[in-house]
Amino acid sequence: MGRGSVTSLAPGFRFHPTDEELVRYYLKRKICNKPFKFDAISVTDVYKSEPWDLPDKSRLKSRDLEWYFFSMLDKKYRNGSKTNRATEMGYWKTTGKDREILNGSKVVGMKKTLVYHKGRAPRGERTNWVMHEYRLVDQDLDKTGVHQDAFVLCRIFQKSGSGPKNGEQYGAPFVEEEWEEEDDMTFVPDQEDLGSEDHVYVHMDDIDQKSENFVVYDAIPIPLNFIHGESSNNVETNYSDSINYIQQTGNYMDSGGYFEQPAESYEKDQKPIIRDRDGSLQNEGIGCGVQDKHSETLQSSDNIFGTDTSCYNDFPVESNYLIGEAFLDPNSNLLENDGLYLETNDLSSTQQDGFDFEDYLTFFDETFDPSQLMGNEDVFFDQEELFQEVETKELEKEETSRSKHVVEEKEKDEASCSKQVDADATEFEPDYKYPLLKKASHMLGAIPAPLANASEFPTKDAAIRLHAAQSSGSVHVTAGMITISDSNMGWSYGKNENLDLILSLGLVQGNTAPEKSGNSSAWAMLIFMCFWVLLLSVSFKVSILVSSR
């Protein structure tokens, strides 16, 4: 058996599917006439060949001791159900019952075990050749009219001896001579060969080499105050010098060691240069609404370059500052060259209109009212509303002062009239003279007074509801009588009067004692009875002992 077939497998690779895979995949696809990804099972008439002749008919070229075949069933009678399994030199005899092949709880096939016997039945000689015959069971195919008995799958192997050989391996033993390296084997190319054929890697020498498309220009000097990140649109750049060296080519330029963009993309990114009537270049405004001495000639009737009220010295002005607050100019705090780092010359330079830190510290003084900043959606306060608020406050003060004078005059009139009234009538003076008495009377009026007659007591049901509404504590507060007399009080009128103050206060013990006393008395009676029973039993015992002697 050679290894020239395309289906030969390397050592360690074996065709060893499970029973379910043989039925659900291989046998079903064969019956439905569908192709296989790996054609490892050949079609032959197993029941017309001897078992020792079948290994040569296998599609898998290996020395394994098991083989797989598709075979058609040969009926013994045309109209019968029995199968003819007789060969020229023997026959295949069924042993045991058919076993079900399950896919979960569903039956997908049947498995039959057969043993080859030499000779004729029933006197044939049993051999070690065994066959497992797999048959498909699919209800869906029955509904479509597919004949499932057209093919069966046979697994044939030879045992090492008589009797059951459970767990026996049927793989071929390894022979090293069969797998020696041959001259016609294909080798994988090395990494060096891959690198020489495919130019995938870039060396450092390739980067140093300059292409012919690169032109070096060293005529443009680099300014002393050059900062990385500055564009050619800076106001301080001399356009008349730099524009003479801009070449209209598609190549890259190297100006002093700095690679720049091509001319096409450079023209797209470059902003237009404004010239006046004399031909001189105009500086480009970086802010909004910049006015220059030469820009007056470019203004039209629409004043397209007019100064915007929302900008101040090329910077947008925040519109949420207060009137009268110091406005800070951003240009006064910036460096001259608009650099992002600090130079030694900047430390020595002094600014005339710099920000005073003391003004910042004294900003939140006592006169500052933060409420003015809240509650108004307008950016600027309306001066007329402020004046109206001041006038309304003054009018309110005048009205309050007038009302005070009217009240004082009224009190004086009432005081003069009270002199002519009897001494008993002084107790019924208005409450606003004595705020303390007014509060005390309200507080004492909320306390319920004790009931005078028995008829005023609530009924039994009302009392139960009243006690249920109260708290479950053992102490309750009821009304009592406390009288304070002969207390002289000095009023603003210079009179000495007697003041009677009545307070109601009292403590009542909760009604928990009867329940406790009732429970304790019951326990006492029970203990007393037990004691007497014990005493009588002891005396009875003693009397029995004495009488026995």
UniProtKB/Swiss-Prot annotation:
Cellular component GO terms, alphabetical: cytoplasm; endoplasmic reticulum membrane; nucleus
Subcellular locations according to the entry: Endoplasmic reticulum membrane; Nucleus
Keyword Electron transport in annotation: no
Topology in the lipid bilayer: Single-pass membrane protein
Any one GO MF annotation of this record: DNA-binding transcription factor activity
Residue ranges for the DNA-binding region feature of this UniProt entry: 108-165
Domain of life: Eukaryota
Domain NAC: 9-159
Expression sites by tissue: Expressed in roots, rosette leaves, cauline leaves, shoot apex and stems.
Disruption phenotype: Delayed leaf senescence and enhanced drought resistance. Enhanced heat resistance.
Pfam families reported for this sequence: NAM (PF02365)
InterPro entries: NAC-dom, NAC_dom_sf
Residue segments, region Disordered: 395-418
Keyword Acyltransferase: no
Domain notes per entry: The NAC domain includes a DNA binding domain and a dimerization domain.
Protein name: NAC domain-containing protein 53
Source organism of this protein record: Arabidopsis thaliana (Mouse-ear cress)
Lineage: Eukaryota, Viridiplantae, Streptophyta, Embryophyta, Tracheophyta
